[in-house]
């Protein structure tokens, strides 16, 4: 084998190694919970920016000694969407009224439990209603969205509930619906300030 062929072989091996490293990095990034949560946040922020809506991230509302955490809150003239984000790439199992659900990690196969996002969301939104009531804010349409934000190919959903169980792509389709453009007279700035005033 002459020097030219050795050089070509060496370059080919380097390219193969770089391709493998890049593929592994992209796979890790696609299944990283922080990256997955940020994708949902980015989707909501882009949607909000075009409409002068607001997005609050990682908010813990407190009132009368109780706390309610929200991954994302979208506030618009239509009302408020409280978003719970389950960011792990896993298979999720659960029933609407069970206290906990089960998830099986797609990489390790390890089984763990997570708090039922449906009942947790109901309690959290009830606390926000009490904050609004104390401040004479009524008639705001509020919804709770659960987004399974993990890698689409590595996430399976077997959770039964009366509210939608969304993947990231489902969230985008949902936000395209006309109801998110309807002006129901919500004062976006006032609601955002009220939530921030009661946040940790």
Language model segments and positions:
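Surface-exposed interaction regions that form or flank ligand-binding interfaces
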Residues: 1-68, 74-96, 101-200
């Amino acid at each position: 084998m002459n020097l030219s062929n050795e050089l070509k072989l060496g370059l080919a091996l380097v390219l193969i190694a770089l391709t493998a490293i890049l593929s592994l990095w992209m796979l890790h990034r696609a299944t990283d919970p922080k990256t997955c949560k940020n994708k949902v946040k980015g989707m909501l922020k882009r949607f909000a920016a075009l409409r002068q809506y607001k997005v609050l991230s990682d908010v813990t509302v407190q009132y009368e000694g109780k706390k309610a955490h929200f991954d994302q809150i979208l506030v618009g003239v239509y009302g408020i969407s409280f978003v719970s984000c389950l960011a792990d790439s896993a298979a999720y199992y659960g029933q609407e009224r069970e206290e906990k659900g089960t998830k099986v990690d797609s990489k390790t196969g390890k089984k763990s439990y997570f708090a039922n996002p449906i009942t947790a969301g109901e309690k959290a939104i009830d606390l926000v209603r009490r904050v609004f009531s104390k401040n004479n804010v009524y008639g705001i349409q509020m919804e709770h969205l659960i987004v399974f934000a993990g890698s689409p190919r590595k996430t399976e959903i077997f959770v039964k509930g009366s509210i939608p169980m969304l993947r990231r792509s489902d969230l985008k389709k949902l936000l395209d619906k006309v109801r998110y453009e309807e002006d129901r007279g919500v004062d976006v700035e006032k609601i955002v300030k009220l939530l921030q005033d009661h946040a940790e």
